Amino acid sequence: MVSLLENPLRVGLQQQGMPEPQIIVIFGASGDLTWRKLVPALYKLRRERRIPPETTIVGVARREWSHEYFREQMQKGMEEAHSSVELGELWQDFSQGLFYCPGDIDNPESYQKLKNLLSELDEKRGTRGNRMFYLSVAPNFFPEAIKQLGGAGMLDDPYKHRLVIEKPFGRDLASAQSLNAVVQKYCKEHQVYRIDHYLGKETVQNLLVFRFANAIFEPLWNRQFVDHVQITVAETVGVEDRAGYYEKAGALRDMLQNHLMQLYCLTAMEAPNSMDADSIRTEKVKVLQATRLADVHNLSRSAIRGQYSAGWMKGQQVPGYRTEPGVDPNSSTPTYVGMKFLVDNWRWQGVPFYLRTGKRMPKKVSEISIHFRDVPSRMFQSAAQQRNANILAMRIQPNEGISLRFDVKMPGAEFRTRSVDMDFSYGSFGIEATSDAYDRLFLDCMMGDQTLFTRADEVEAAWQVVTPALSVWDSPADPATIPQYEAGTWEPAEAEFLINQDGRRWRRL
């Protein structure tokens, strides 16, 4: 296996520069995201010599931990979640840059204490006043944390102070607008990094290159040649220990409004004027503003929700959503959402986009598939059984890569055809692992590159698209009316009808 530094895809390319030393302050540092994803991502960047050794991490949470105890907890987390990563001399050096500051989100004294610690660390670690404030806390704490940071003067420098906000950004259009108002009171837009870790995945980033760097595909990327598009993000896990959060969010807020909408934007947007952050995000906003649910007057024809019931996963029986610990037995929270979008613009007029996401599905898989129109006349035997024989599929996870399906003649005397796939896989290069989403996003934020982060108007435009469904689904509902699908199956029957009514079917993955 070769290391990422020896990635053959990077041969001959100039590596991204190294950011300035800075302090990364993680609010909610006692949560599992810190030791599972955030600290490991930063350690990986240090291991690959992508960030300077002066990089400093300060954890903030309510627990009364010491610096040393915080370091011990991060090391335990690394050993548990990333057992294959060597923790030797480099980890010892890296961990000396880990510090902890106990405090309450709503206590001004906590922020003054934090401010004093950061000033001390600037002198000790040589971080030159550069700060990144990462809000890895429950969404209801976002406004208060931002107000307190702003009130303490820790967001005053628009060029040295950056604010990173985890999704979900609001729970509907009104709350997103309210949160944006708080952010804009204390920050310039170029200071704000609204993070969606899906945008850090290699295949998602490659989508822009694939579309706009290859002349053979872009001319086909329109209503003349594309029959429809499917975007799937399927999970095998259930609600697990997130019932408290999930009961308030559901699949639409947790996944579709952010992750799937980002995949949708990159698939449907026009070519940007340049590859700078604002040009790309402006095109994403434009396509969102042209997007609508196919039929807002008869919602069942364009938006379907569902819940998983008891079933079998990998030979083991699993409970239904309503019997999971912490879930209301009469819950109407969707664990599955399927939607049909139409785009009112020149490129995509009349081409449906089908999006679906759900928990307890047969496979963990994320994919975008472009289904091209049929040939005008069927000339070959057995091809008549195939509709949309040409499919371009971009696999986000697992086995990141791209495949193109087309028909070929089967060997033999008869003119019979079958479909074959031409594949590109990142794994075929012998690379141990493609870059993790969080390490790429951390690096971009430290470098001041907002390309993979969402802008205020983009967030609001995405909420606007799904508002017709939210306004209905947020109303009290009879639990008996919520479609069910058995754990280990793909979707409720109503979601099959969503696409079957158009003479199409979901792609089996």
Swiss-Prot record:
Binding sites annotated in the UniProt record for substrate: 197, 201, 235, 254, 359, 364
Positions annotated to bind NADP(+): 62, 104-105, 167
GO cellular component: cytosol
Taxonomic superkingdom: Bacteria
This protein's UniProt keywords: Carbohydrate metabolism, Glucose metabolism, NADP, Oxidoreductase
Enzyme Commission number(s): 1.1.1.49
Residue numbers annotated as active site: 259
Pathway: Carbohydrate degradation; pentose phosphate pathway; D-ribulose 5-phosphate from D-glucose 6-phosphate (oxidative stage): step 1/3
Reactions catalysed: D-glucose 6-phosphate + NADP(+) = 6-phospho-D-glucono-1,5-lactone + NADPH + H(+)
A molecular-function term among this protein's GO annotations: NADP binding
GO terms, biological process: glucose metabolic process; pentose-phosphate shunt, oxidative branch
InterPro entries: G6P_DH, G6P_DH_AS, G6P_DH_C, G6P_DH_NAD-bd, NAD(P)-bd_dom_sf
Entry's family note: Belongs to the glucose-6-phosphate dehydrogenase family.
Function: Catalyzes the oxidation of glucose 6-phosphate to 6-phosphogluconolactone.
Protein name (Swiss-Prot/TrEMBL): Glucose-6-phosphate 1-dehydrogenase
Gene coding for it: zwf
